[in-house]
C-alpha cells in the first residue's frame, strides 16, 4: 500500500521537471529576432534613367531616379567608369528628397563611351542596392582631315583654302588635273558630316567643277560650281563605314584631253564621331 504514494510523488516530480524544462526553453527566445533577420534580408531597390544616351561633347546630361525604401536625407552615390571593364569611381553624391528621389547632372567633356550607376549604401535598415548600368556614348566634332585617308588620287589636304571669298581651315583641294578623289574610313562611328563645297578662288573663270560625296557606295551629294559659287553640305553618316569625295574638272579653255583648271574644294569638312 505504500508503493502508491511513492509512485505518485515520483510522477509529480517528473511533471515538475518537464514543466521547468519547457519554461526554460521558452525563456531563451530573443525578442525582435525575426524582425532583425527580415531587415538584414531586405535590399534597397534603385532605379535610374539618363536624359541622353548620345550627347555631344560639352553638353550636360541628367541622371535621376528613386530608392525604395527611401528616407529623406539619405545619401546616394553616382558612380562612373569608362568602357565596360574599367574601375567604378565616385562621380558625385546626392541626398534623397521626401519622395525617395535623387538627381545628378554632369557635363560630358570627353569623346568616349562611359557607364553610370547609382549606389545606395547599406545601413541598419537594408543591404546596399544599385541601379542598372546606364551607357552613354559621347560624340564630338573633328576635322575629316584628322583621319588618315585610305585612298587618294590627285587631291590634297591643306591648312586653309579660299572659296567664294571666304577662308576655310583644314580643307581638301583638287590638284590641277582632270579628276581625282579622296576617301576616309569613319567605321560606323560617326553620325553627321558638314562642310562647304565650291571652287578654290584661284581657279580660272572658264572652269567649272563637279563634286560628288559617297557614303559607302551611295551617292549622298552632288553639285557643280564655278568661281564665286559655293554651298554648305550636311550629310547623315549613321551606319556609314567610308566617305569618299570625288571631283571632275571642266574647262572651256582646255583641250579634249586636258580639262583641268577647276580646283574643286571642300572647306573645313568635319564629322561628328564617338572617337
Please provide the spans of the model-predicted regions.
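Low-complexity, Ser/Thr/Pro-rich intrinsically disordered linker/stalk segments at domain junctions
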Residues: 2-140
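Gly-Asp-aromatic-enriched flexible segments
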Residues: 132-275
Amino acid at each position: 500500500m505504500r508503493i502508491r504514494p511513492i509512485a505518485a510523488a515520483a510522477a509529480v516530480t517528473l511533471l515538475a521537471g518537464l514543466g521547468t524544462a519547457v519554461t526554460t526553453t521558452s525563456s531563451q527566445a530573443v525578442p525582435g529576432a525575426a524582425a532583425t533577420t527580415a531587415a538584414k534580408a531586405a535590399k534597397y531597390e534603385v532605379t535610374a534613367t539618363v536624359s541622353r544616351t548620345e550627347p555631344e561633347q560639352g553638353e550636360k546630361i541628367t541622371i535621376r531616379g528613386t530608392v525604395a525604401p527611401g528616407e529623406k536625407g539619405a545619401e546616394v552615390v553616382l558612380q562612373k567608369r569608362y568602357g565596360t571593364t574599367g574601375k567604378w569611381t565616385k562621380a558625385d553624391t546626392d541626398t534623397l528628397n521626401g519622395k525617395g528621389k535623387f538627381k545628378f547632372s554632369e557635363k560630358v567633356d570627353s569623346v568616349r563611351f562611359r557607364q553610370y550607376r547609382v549606389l545606395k549604401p547599406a545601413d541598419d535598415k537594408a543591404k546596399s542596392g544599385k541601379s542598372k548600368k546606364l551607357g552613354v556614348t559621347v560624340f564630338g566634332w573633328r576635322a575629316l582631315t584628322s583621319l588618315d585617308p585610305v585612298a587618294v588620287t590627285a587631291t590634297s589636304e591643306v591648312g586653309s583654302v579660299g572659296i567664294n571669298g571666304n577662308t576655310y581651315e583644314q580643307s581638301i583641294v583638287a590638284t590641277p588635273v582632270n579628276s581625282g578623289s579622296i576617301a576616309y574610313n569613319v567605321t560606323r562611328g560617326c553620325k553627321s558630316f558638314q562642310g562647304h563645297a565650291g571652287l578654290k578662288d584661284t581657279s580660272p573663270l572658264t572652269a567649272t567643277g563637279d563634286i560628288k560625296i559617297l557614303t559607302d557606295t551611295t551617292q549622298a551629294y552632288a553639285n557643280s560650281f564655278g568661281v564665286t559659287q559655293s554651298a554648305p553640305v550636311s550629310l547623315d553618316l549613321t551606319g556609314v563605314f567610308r566617305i569618299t569625295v570625288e571631283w571632275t574638272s571642266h574647262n572651256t579653255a582646255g583641250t579634249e584631253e586636258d580639262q583641268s583648271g577647276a580646283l574643286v574644294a571642300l572647306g573645313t569638312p568635319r564629322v561628328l564621331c564617338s572617337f
